[in-house]
Design a protein with these regions (language model features):
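Charge-biased, low-complexity intrinsically disordered regions
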Residues: 1-221
């Protein structure tokens, strides 16, 4: 497991922040039918019970948006991933199918409202991560997005540089079909509420769909 430190600048901007990190050995696949049955069921539930305007008021998403503002980012322009995924489904656009690890992280993010970083643990440089705030000119290549302006965004950094924000993770540490160890980080900008449930939900999906024993969970703040 990695050591994860929360910087003073994050603690000042979001004193209630708490996180859960989950590390596990996994076997990734291109597609899993059982997982997609769960994703499709959630999509039907969300679109039949939610209005577009409700999304930003979901408690975890709301707290993440408020943290963006305090860190210096406009959440209307740079949406937290959980919000962006829900808005996508509400517009009638299906969730993109990437691979089983990415898809199951997206499902937990959709269900809980937490923005979750999913990383190939073997691509992370060093054994220590720190959550800070992005700086002007700090280079960050978002997955499928190209260069992302992370100034004012919460960002996890390894010994080489940024690897993940609540808007997008970095191409350098992304999961793919060759991934055999996952590090998933659940970001609780609303505090500890729901963290354990989200982390255990990831564990359950990993056990069900990636031949994993579920790995271990560490909480940090």
């Amino acid at each position: 497991m990695f050591e994860i430190k929360v910087s003073k600048e994050i603690k000042d901007a979001c004193p209630v922040f708490a996180g859960a990190a989950m590390y596990a050995a996994v076997k990734n696949t291109a597609y899993n039918e059982g997982l997609w049955q769960e994703i499709d069921a959630f999509t039907r539930q969300l679109t039949s019970t939610t209005q577009m305007e409700d999304i930003k008021h979901q408690p975890v998403i709301f707290a993440t948006r408020e943290a963006y503002k305090r860190c210096g980012k406009d959440p209307g322009r740079y949406r937290p991933s959980a919000e962006a995924l829900r808005r996508r489904l509400m517009r009638g656009i299906p969730l993109y199918q990437i691979d089983t690890l990415v898809d199951l992280i997206n499902l937990v993010s959709l269900r809980t409202g937490h923005s979750i970083g999913g990383f190939d643990a073997d691509k992370i440089q060093g054994t220590r991560l720190e959550l800070g705030i992005g700086k002007a000119g700090e280079r960050f290549e978002g997955i499928g997005r190209g260069v992302l302006n992370i100034e004012g965004l919460p960002v996890y950094r390894d010994s080489f540089g940024g690897i993940g924000t609540p808007t997008s993770d970095h191409e350098r540490t992304k999961m793919d079909l060759g991934t055999t160890h996952i590090l998933a980080i659940v970001n609780g900008y609303n505090g500890k509420e729901g963290l354990r449930e989200a982390a255990e939900m990831i564990q359950t999906l990993l056990r069900n769909y990636t031949e994993s024993d579920g790995g271990e969970i560490v909480f940090f703040e």
